[in-house]
Amino acid sequence: MIGGTRSPKVSVVVPTHDSGPHIEKLVASLLRQSLPAAEFEAVFVDDGSTDGTPARLAELAAAHPHFRVLRIENSGWPSRPRNLGVAHARGEYVLFADDDDWLGDEALERLHDCARTHDADVVVGRMAGHGRSVPRELFRRNRFDATLANSPLIDSLTCHKMFRRAFLDEHGLRFPEGPLRRLEDHRMVVRSYFLSRRTCVLSDYTCYHHARRGDAGNVTATRLDPAEYYASLREALDIVDAHTEPGPLRDRLHRRWLRNEMLNRVRGRRMLDAPEEWLAQVVREIQGVIRERFAPGVAAGLPPLQRVLAHLAEQGRVADLRRLAEWETGVRAAGTVDRHEVAGTALTVTVSARLESAGRPVTFAADGDRDLLVLPVDDLDPVLRDMTAALGRSRLDVVARRRETSEEVLLPVTSDTRWVPGPAGERHLVHHAVATVDGAALDAGTWSLKARVTCAGWTEDTRLPLVLRPAGDGAAPAVEDERALWTRLRRAVRRRIGRR
């Protein structure tokens, strides 16, 4: 109870710095929360803003008793404001939010209910990305006893979660404030996963909207210093090593940083747009981490494209990385709707999809009983390009995406993957899936369908021509086939031209 004797259920801790109008979505979402205002507080910690942010926060605190504002001299990074927010928080649970993100309207109520129902120390709510990538596989289903060993929990290392405040205090879990500032949330969150008595993943509601500011104005959007960044990454690896023994689990956890923070920086458009001198520094740092910190099983467990990237980076072959990046910019998923039917409120759709490069299928060459990914780089050990182990992890998902909010729902599918021979002895993979969606269970809005191909080291989306428009009242949704719309438009254009 704010201003009374009872502590609030939740404290939302928000670091701010020159937030400007970007904070308004978060503020509006806090004011829309289904959890009563008397049962939560928002603790804004302003990190030395030089614009109108302090005045706006003071205005909000004056109007809303459950909003509190603290001001500090500029520290230059979110760690200190977050830590100060925790020190002043009064809630049973703490949720960290950034000033340019926002919450789902029922986020606090649902996350707190989940935490109390399952006596959880940590609750991870489903996220939607707006110009930012967010975990996907983790949110395929609810998980009420998730661990780093039994789930892809390691895919979610941002701090935008709900933590039991007593748990944070018991273990001294705070964000590092030392000279190594990058990946501060990784180091705090991965420790919390190891120490948590129970961690839940709430996947049936979009709790958090993670956005990239159009002006790239927040501090984490600045170009990283490679030496500082990878020194911070090494500290995250130290935490993993302190809680695991050498072996498959440690390799799998290390693999997350190799894949996301290392290889993703030296592939595709991201690499081609980077300054050459800076990129050379990044590759040198990656090379050092791979050689000094990773067991052979870390890279060996990757799919073939990423194994090749790891090998090229470890060898310092920047020219070959660039050649591969130029080719990879042409890789896309191509999908078709083979059939669809509506029965009652349910839509069943049959989809086929494959990976293409410049309009031609991504191919594999036979090598005895192996199929090797064909890449535009020479002098590669066939083991690096071998698709055998990764074939079972290839799949086709069908995703419903709400246009108004960018939230995504992975639909239940039955799927299979088949080899298709080519004219010159090569072959490629075609993925098939049958998905069913109950339109009556979707929130009101416009939902697009897309196919998501995961294969050989790529995860690529392609839009499908079906759109659902549920009203949110439990009735059957309208289903539009955009192919039919375009056919009608083409016919209308031809008729109009024919009259001239």
Region spans (language model):
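Amphipathic alpha-helical repeat scaffolds of TPR domains
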Residues: 255-265
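Long, charge-rich alpha-helical interaction segments
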Residues: 251-252
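Short glycine/serine- and small hydrophobic-enriched flexible loop segments
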Residues: 194, 238, 264-268
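Hydrophobic, Leu/Ile/Phe/Ala-enriched alpha-helical segments that form helix-helix packing faces
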Residues: 30, 34, 61, 236-240, ...
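Basic, ligand-binding patches in group-transfer machinery
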Residues: 2, 7, 267-500
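Catalytic core of nucleotide-sugar-dependent glycosyltransferases
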Residues: 205-213, 219-247, 261-262, 272-292
